[in-house]
């Protein structure tokens, strides 16, 4: 009994609830009940743990603290855990491998690093933060692995196989907002800035193009006004080439 009591207090300390060990469940908040449930699951030291959105009722800072604790427990005890969440950062931070599911089917199973850099298709790309997905076709194959590709509306850019690997005749290019840079010179994808928002370290621009609304980031030193015509240049470090598939010309809401 003493060992069980000791183990229970240890788990309550891990979830930050030891000071409320004697409080009745009816006197606990939703977030506190969630942490108690987590402690109950951990205290029996199971070889396999199943978590279904265990941190959903916690505030942002506590969520970060708790996922660190869960990861430490996994690694210390060599436990296997299946963890269900819609939070990308949460999934990546505690996992050795992540499965992305669509309509009940696994569409990609990989390490967090591979998922983040090389999504298998447009669905996975959107889940891991590629907000801009554009169909393209190759119009010219140049020297040194470079290709000229054209987007809807006629904008053309040069891509390199050194950055993307083999580039198909038709495909999708997916970019994160930091992968598109506004350029007043008009190079890249032709757009008009529809909305500018200040994020602190950068400005975010919602740019209207023939292919729909694209989200880009720009320096705070040289902001552009709404209504400005700009070209968007593509940074391959924050972009990926995907297999061609039919997608909506407008961003999902």
Each predicted region: which residue ranges?
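ABC ATPase nucleotide-binding domains
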Residues: 1-123
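ABC transporter nucleotide-binding domain
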Residues: 111-144
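Glycine/charge-rich catalytic "coupling/switch" loops of P-loop NTPases
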Residues: 117, 132, 146-197, 221-253
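Short, structured beta-strand/loop micro-motifs enriched in basic residues and often containing a Trp
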Residues: 154, 211-214
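A short macromolecule-binding patch
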Residues: 158, 214-217
């Amino acid at each position: 009994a003493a060992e069980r009591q000791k183990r229970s207090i240890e788990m309550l300390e891990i979830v930050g609830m030891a000071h409320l060990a004697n409080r009745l469940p009816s006197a606990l908040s939703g977030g506190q009940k969630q942490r108690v449930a987590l402690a109950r699951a951990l205290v029996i030291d199971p070889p396999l743990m199943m978590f279904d959105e265990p941190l959903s009722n916690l505030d942002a800072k506590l969520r970060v603290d708790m996922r660190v604790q869960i990861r430490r427990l996994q690694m210390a005890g060599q436990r296997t855990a299946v963890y269900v969440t819609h939070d990308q950062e949460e999934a990546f931070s505690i996992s050795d491998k992540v499965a992305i599911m669509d309509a009940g089917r696994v569409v990609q199973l990989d390490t967090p690093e591979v998922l983040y850099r090389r999504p298998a298709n447009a669905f996975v790309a959107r889940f891991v933060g590629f907000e801009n997905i554009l169909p393209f076709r190759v119009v010219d194959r140049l020297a040194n692995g470079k290709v000229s590709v054209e987007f809807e509306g006629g904008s053309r850019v040069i891509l390199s196989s050194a950055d993307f690997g083999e580039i198909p005749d038709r495909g999708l290019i997916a970019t994160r907002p930091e992968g598109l840079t506004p350029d007043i010179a008009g190079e890249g994808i032709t757009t008009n800035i529809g909305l500018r928002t200040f994020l602190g370290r950068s400005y975010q621009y919602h740019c209207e193009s023939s292919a729909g609304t694209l989200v880009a980031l720009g320096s705070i030193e040289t902001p552009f006004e709404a209504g400005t015509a700009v070209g968007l240049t593509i940074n391959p470090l924050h972009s990926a080439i995907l297999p061609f598939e039919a997608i909506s010309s407008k961003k999902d809401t």
